[in-house]
Amino acid sequence: MKKKTSLSEEDQALFRQLMVGTRQIKQDTIVHRPLRKKITEVPTRRLIQEQADASHYFSDEFQPLLNTEGPVKYVREDVSHFELKKMRRGDYSPELFLDLHGLTQLQAKQELGALIAACRREHIFCACVMHGHGKHILKQQTPLWLAQHPHVMAFHQAPKEYGGDAALLVLIEVEEWQPPELP
């Protein structure tokens, strides 16, 4: 294939005259890749869907049978009762706290669902839910909702340093973390 030049012979001669004593630069070091935006945040649509899925389990019509005497507590059938004892003694310290003060029941359900979804996503085993005293509506409903969720392993009235009888410590079942497979 024949090279086409767009410069006249005079211009080419002038260019060569000006370039006397220079040498061509070698590009042998770095190849620049085009900049791409890294996606580090989970898309908000997915987060909203996770929260909605997690709050789907909470029903006001179904009321699980919980012991009404003594502190509020619950343990799933396949979980050891020793976990309740460890929660009561304060062996677990919560990594996430949820404050339900001032929320409606619908908002509280959504926030509980969001808390459980966040714990599973971040591999957090123990969380604290502060329902407060108030008119005792959320104080009564929160344990009933938590007992219905399949990812809640156990909950117990929180020790005094985490809110006492105005809060619950919740153990959440998280998936085992596995390192990614190498190719």
Swiss-Prot record:
Enzyme class: hydrolase
Record domain Smr: where: 98-173
Domain of life: Bacteria
InterPro entries (alphabetical): Smr_dom, Smr_dom_sf, SmrB-like
Keywords, in A-Z order: Endonuclease, Hydrolase, Nuclease, RNA-binding, rRNA-binding
One record GO biological process: rescue of stalled ribosome
Keyword presence, Secreted: no
GO molecular function, one term: RNA endonuclease activity
PROSITE patterns, alphabetized: SMR
Signal sequence coordinates: none
Pfam family, one: Smr
EC number: 3.1.-.-
Function according to Swiss-Prot or TrEMBL: Acts as a ribosome collision sensor. Detects stalled/collided disomes (pairs of ribosomes where the leading ribosome is stalled and a second ribosome has collided with it) and endonucleolytically cleaves mRNA at the 5' boundary of the stalled ribosome. Stalled/collided disomes form a new interface (primarily via the 30S subunits) that binds SmrB. Cleaved mRNA becomes available for tmRNA ligation, leading to ribosomal subunit dissociation and rescue of stalled ribosomes.
Family to which this protein belongs: Belongs to the SmrB family.
Assembly information from the UniProt record: Associates with collided ribosomes, but not with correctly translating polysomes.
Stored HAMAP family: SmrB (MF_01042)
Protein name: Ribosome rescue factor SmrB
Gene source species: Salmonella paratyphi A (strain AKU_12601)
